């Protein structure tokens, strides 16, 4: 767990570096691990590196272990030579096959030793992927088995190969949190969050957000978090904001096989497109009609390349958002692509207290872009800070307008943050950019801040001068506060 270093945070999102000693490379995170099927390579691994900048990929050691055609070649050549890839390679253990078919014929020790023997850089033990919504008894029993296997995996001699510790627990937040803490206790290196693909397939992004948040509570900040099977670019920003560092998926190839075209807003069918809304080489060199007229293999490869361009482009966008401190604005933007993604964003904000713990106290700017912005971690932090700010005098004015000498002290008020001392006006997040037509959620959040301050100082007499706040906001202000409308005539 000493192979991962965080360079920068935004919310729970992390710019980090994962050192993979066996490969001799350091991978910048967040990043995507394209799934490479050793039997069917829609895009060659060497092309993934040269054209898309792939530093790491994932393949299935269980398929290699059981393949009459590939088992001996991979043992003789090694995984890197077999795939033609110089970067880091992670291998899965067969747990996906276990989830799909109910049984596999290999143990954790056998598959880890095989992964080490073929030259894998990051290995995976055989865990039990417990699907969502199973009864608690089953989830608990399977979790116990997974933990026993992880503890056994920690005793296997794998040399420099990193070993992952999958976190299970179905859709029970307390089981996920406990499983995550137990995974950390094994001393293993990478922490995949397992059995979440059904949630993504069913667009249950709110449930996904709750699962990831629970896992993160148990994991803390000890190592890289891998969201198993997450490969659609529309959800990278949300998952990164929750603290996920690694994503993997075969979606780029599987979707291309079905003539599906990835965007950051969702998925389009090729035959329903008249124009390509993308500027990648595939989309600038071809029209949808031209691709549709090609033979199936050529069309599949070009669509897969487009899907990869969009995927890696979104990873770069997420990285820059973390660097610039506007990851939450990006999440907000991506949430508008699908109603279920908006549900996911709102569920993410249910965990704003958790996100606030690693969110930087100062950034370049706060942009209020939707009603959801009123629930961001910065708003919570400002209102928590009221507990530490002194109030001078017995008569205090809280106003969206100018100060008044009639009071012992005058504080400003800025929706959605609420009251603040004037000397903090030029500090983050009070330098926020907010629309002139502020929405109800911002006023209500500001009123919550007013209530917080008033309750902290019961012996002070407060007057609130507001700019036409709605009744739903004013109802949150304590009864003892005198209310005046900024534009009302005396």
Swiss-Prot record:
<keyword id="KW-0328">Glycosyltransferase</keyword>
<comment type="function">
    <text>Exchanges the guanine residue with 7-cyano-7-deazaguanine (preQ0) at position 15 in the dihydrouridine loop (D-loop) of archaeal tRNAs.</text>
</comment>
<keyword id="KW-0808">Transferase</keyword>
<feature type="binding site">
    <location>
        <position position="278"/>
    </location>
    <ligand>
        <name>Zn(2+)</name>
    </ligand>
</feature>
<dbReference type="InterPro" id="IPR050076">
    <property type="entry name" value="ArchSynthase1/Queuine_TRR"/>
</dbReference>
<dbReference type="GO" id="GO:0008270">
    <property type="term" value="F:zinc ion binding"/>
</dbReference>
<feature type="active site" description="Nucleophile">
    <location>
        <position position="92"/>
    </location>
</feature>
<dbReference type="Pfam" id="PF01702">
    <property type="entry name" value="TGT"/>
</dbReference>
<dbReference type="InterPro" id="IPR002616">
    <property type="entry name" value="tRNA_ribo_trans-like"/>
</dbReference>
<dbReference type="GO" id="GO:0005737">
    <property type="term" value="C:cytoplasm"/>
</dbReference>
<dbReference type="InterPro" id="IPR036511">
    <property type="entry name" value="TGT-like_sf"/>
</dbReference>
<keyword id="KW-0862">Zinc</keyword>
<comment type="pathway">
    <text>tRNA modification; archaeosine-tRNA biosynthesis.</text>
</comment>
<feature type="binding site">
    <location>
        <position position="283"/>
    </location>
    <ligand>
        <name>Zn(2+)</name>
    </ligand>
</feature>
<keyword id="KW-0479">Metal-binding</keyword>
<comment type="similarity">
    <text>Belongs to the archaeosine tRNA-ribosyltransferase family.</text>
</comment>
<dbReference type="InterPro" id="IPR038370">
    <property type="entry name" value="ArcTGT_C1_sf"/>
</dbReference>
<feature type="binding site">
    <location>
        <position position="280"/>
    </location>
    <ligand>
        <name>Zn(2+)</name>
    </ligand>
</feature>
<protein>
    <recommendedName>
        <fullName>tRNA-guanine(15) transglycosylase</fullName>
        <ecNumber>2.4.2.48</ecNumber>
    </recommendedName>
</protein>
<dbReference type="InterPro" id="IPR004804">
    <property type="entry name" value="TgtA"/>
</dbReference>
<feature type="binding site">
    <location>
        <position position="127"/>
    </location>
    <ligand>
        <name>substrate</name>
    </ligand>
</feature>
<dbReference type="GO" id="GO:0002099">
    <property type="term" value="P:tRNA wobble guanine modification"/>
</dbReference>
<keyword id="KW-0819">tRNA processing</keyword>
<feature type="binding site">
    <location>
        <position position="195"/>
    </location>
    <ligand>
        <name>substrate</name>
    </ligand>
</feature>
<dbReference type="GO" id="GO:0016763">
    <property type="term" value="F:pentosyltransferase activity"/>
</dbReference>
